């Protein structure tokens, strides 16, 4: 029989399976990577029990819960937990504070012979632990910042380095006005939880430094912690420099060719290009004010023509026109301004291949 645990660090370092028995509405606001939500009480039941608790006290609320979740419904939920536990025998369960819902779930499982240890303090304690660890890691771990103009394939370099944290991957967003991906983004709490876990795993590996991409305060709608924003502005930099032609090719792959495959997985082959085209046009419209009316109209027209050719024969070459203009006239001046405001020492500067070789040599 395993004991309940308060070793939160071990849970996250080992990717321990976690069963979240909170209501779906609570889970949607914030959870942990890989956690499974099989609620003891659903949203409506939670609402009714909460009102009962406020009006009549704990015992009345418990009695109402037992009335709402009984018979076949109780057996259905118990069976779902049983199936999960058989697949994850080293797991732990938790509710919000590690209290009555966890203990009730634990007791029901014990009735059918399953030892189900819980996380002491529940979700609230785990969340507090991750917030504290995230801030400690940001303050104490040595960071290096990978910089470069749009299309330098910074994310590809990040993905190849074992001591790197892919912030855009955690945010499920490519980090620009055109960076939205099908499936949407995690909640802010989910993003922070994933970031904290990535940081403590890097700390455990004891790298010489941790590499992150030069990001603004927002990756899509995910907000970087203020402390990390400050570190990105001040820590040593590694700069990738690539020709405009090379960056146009990478941007074509990252904005058009690669995303089309993603959209096909979400919406099917038939609707993928329309969905992607609508998103690209919406992205162009979102930066209309910064582009200016005439330039926005020109780029939008080029994009529409490129999408029409692609729909007709599958050729993506015409996309290079609007991408070239977008990089040269919009993203490059913005990047040059931002880079001029960075204070960190430049550790290395070179092509993507040279930067990768530099990183791999250490």
Curated annotation (Swiss-Prot):
- Active site, per annotation: 95
Catalysed reaction(s) here are: 5-methylaminomethyl-2-thiouridine(34) in tRNA + selenophosphate + (2E)-geranyl diphosphate + H2O + H(+) = 5-methylaminomethyl-2-selenouridine(34) in tRNA + (2E)-thiogeraniol + phosphate + diphosphate; 5-methylaminomethyl-2-thiouridine(34) in tRNA + (2E)-geranyl diphosphate = 5-methylaminomethyl-S-(2E)-geranyl-thiouridine(34) in tRNA + diphosphate; 5-methylaminomethyl-S-(2E)-geranyl-thiouridine(34) in tRNA + selenophosphate + H(+) = 5-methylaminomethyl-2-(Se-phospho)selenouridine(34) in tRNA + (2E)-thiogeraniol; 5-methylaminomethyl-2-(Se-phospho)selenouridine(34) in tRNA + H2O = 5-methylaminomethyl-2-selenouridine(34) in tRNA + phosphate
- What region holds the Rhodanese domain? 12-135
Please list which residues make up the signal peptide.
none
SUPFAM superfamilies in the cross-refs: Rhodanese/Cell cycle control phosphatase
Membrane-crossing residue ranges in chain numbering:
none
Q: What is its EC number?
A: 2.9.1.3
Q: Which UniProt keywords apply?
A: Selenium, Transferase
Record-level GO BP terms: tRNA wobble uridine modification
Offer an example of a GO molecular function term for this protein: transferase activity, transferring alkyl or aryl (other than methyl) groups
InterPro entries membership = Rhodanese-like_dom, Rhodanese-like_dom_sf, SelU
What exactly does this protein do? Involved in the post-transcriptional modification of the uridine at the wobble position (U34) of tRNA(Lys), tRNA(Glu) and tRNA(Gln). Catalyzes the conversion of 2-thiouridine (S2U-RNA) to 2-selenouridine (Se2U-RNA). Acts in a two-step process involving geranylation of 2-thiouridine (S2U) to S-geranyl-2-thiouridine (geS2U) and subsequent selenation of the latter derivative to 2-selenouridine (Se2U) in the tRNA chain.
Q: Which NCBIfam families match?
A: PRK11784.1-3, tRNA_sel_U_synt
Homology family = Belongs to the SelU family.
Assembly, in brief, is:
Monomer.
**Protein name as catalogued:** tRNA 2-selenouridine synthase
Q: Which organism is it from?
A: Alcanivorax borkumensis (strain ATCC 700651 / DSM 11573 / NCIMB 13689 / SK2)
User: Lineage of this protein's species?
Assistant: Bacteria, Pseudomonadati, Pseudomonadota, Gammaproteobacteria, Oceanospirillales
């Amino acid at each position: 029989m395993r004991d309940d645990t308060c070793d939160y660090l071990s849970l996250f370092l080992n990717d321990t399976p976690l069963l979240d028995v909170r209501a779906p509405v609570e889970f949607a606001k914030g959870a942990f990577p890989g956690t499974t939500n099989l609620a003891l009480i659903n949203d409506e039941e939670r609402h009714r029990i909460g009102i009962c608790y406020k009006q009549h006290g704990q015992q009345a609320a418990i009695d109402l819960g037992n009335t709402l979740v009984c018979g076949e419904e109780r057996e259905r939920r118990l069976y779902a937990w049983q199936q999960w536990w058989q697949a994850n025998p080293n797991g732990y369960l938790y509710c919000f504070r590690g209290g009555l819902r966890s203990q009730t779930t634990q007791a029901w499982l014990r009735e059918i012979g399953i030892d189900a240890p819980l996380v002491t303090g529940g979700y609230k304690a785990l969340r507090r632990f991750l917030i504290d660890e995230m801030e400690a890691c940001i303050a104490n771990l040595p960071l290096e910042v990978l910089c470069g103009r749009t299309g330098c394939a910074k994310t590809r370099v990040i993905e190849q380095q074992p001591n790197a944290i892919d912030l855009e991957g955690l945010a499920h967003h490519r980090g620009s006005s055109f960076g939205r991906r099908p499936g949407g983004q995690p909640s802010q709490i989910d993003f922070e939880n994933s970031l904290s876990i990535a940081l403590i795993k890097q700390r455990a590996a004891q790298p010489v430094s941790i590499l992150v991409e030069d990001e603004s305060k927002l990756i899509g709608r995910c907000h970087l912690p203020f402390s990390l924003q400050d570190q990105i502005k001040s820590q040593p930099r590694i700069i990738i420099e690539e020709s405009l032609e090379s960056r146009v090719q990478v941007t074509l792959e990252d904005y058009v060719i690669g995303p089309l495959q993603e959209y096909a997985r979400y919406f099917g082959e038939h609707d993928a290009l329309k969905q992607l085209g609508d998103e690209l046009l919406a992205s162009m419209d979102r930066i209309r004010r910064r582009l200016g009316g005439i330039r926005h109209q020109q780029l939008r027209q080029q994009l529409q023509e490129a999408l029409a050719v692609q729909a007709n024969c599958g050729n993506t070459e015409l996309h290079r026109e609007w991408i070239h203009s977008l990089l040269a006239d919009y993203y490059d001046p913005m990047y040059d301004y931002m880079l001029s405001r960075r204070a960190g020492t430049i550790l290395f500067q070179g092509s993507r291949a040279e930067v990768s070789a530099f990183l791999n040599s250490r």
